[in-house]
Amino acid sequence: MAKGNSPLERPSLASLDQKLAFAKRCSHEGVLAGAKAAVVASVASAIPTLASVRMLPWARANLNHTAQALIISTATAAAYFIVADKTVLATARKNSFNQPSNSEA
């Protein structure tokens, strides 16, 4: 086994710092992508929800302000978490293939 590849060896402090910085960068990219998706989803769900309450008699009678807010916020939260999760996983997957192995040094 090449030096540095043994699972019994303790990782160096520099290696841990590098992994921590990578994790922070991945999560930051996920937060930004999730926030962008949440804004788009809130607008995309608010417009038809509010329009239907004004134009459809059934929606006017059955969807109060709380129901409207719940519809919009559910779509927003779902978009945020789905996109953030996919972005973090994609970034980690992409960068895991780019890491040089210790045996090549």
From Swiss-Prot:
Any one of the GO CC terms: membrane
Broad class of where this protein is predominantly found: membrane
Membrane topology: Single-pass membrane protein
Keyword Isomerase listed: no
UniProt KW Thylakoid keyword: no
InterPro entries: Enod93 (IPR005050)
Transmembrane segments: 66-83
Localization in the cell: Membrane
Key words of the record: Membrane, Nodulation, Transmembrane, Transmembrane helix
One BP annotation, GO: nodulation
Pfam family, one: ENOD93
Superkingdom of the organism of origin: Eukaryota
Protein name: Early nodulin-93
Organism ancestry: Eukaryota, Viridiplantae, Streptophyta, Embryophyta, Tracheophyta
